[in-house]
């Protein structure tokens, strides 16, 4: 029996990324739970879970040799998980770095945008790429709303890492 992988490069690299996230999750959660308590544990679990979901959905979408409705479902999941990863990446920043009312407000805003984005992808997977890109980028840069508090709370290197990540993803 011959197995056909639709897009081997993407399938393999995304599978490797998913497995790396899976293997990194346990030690990170143990460290977060022991050193920092439940809120850090939860934030890290959501972040790592979002990474596993994104790379798992993407590896599956690029692997399966399907057509028609089945392929369309996997494509929707692949695209929807981008919103989950962006929101999942915000979760530790909101819960750990910002905390309090500001952190929870930003968290609700980001996950709200993610929910709308996932709904758009579920209902309109053929939307123009520019439309999706605008939502992804806007969601990624919503942190400028809390630029001041982030700058006060984070060390300069941590802030520069956060800023660099935003620039690279944009």
Q: Model-derived features: where do they sit?
A:
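Multi-pass alpha-helical transmembrane bundles in non-GPCR membrane proteins
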Residues: 1-170
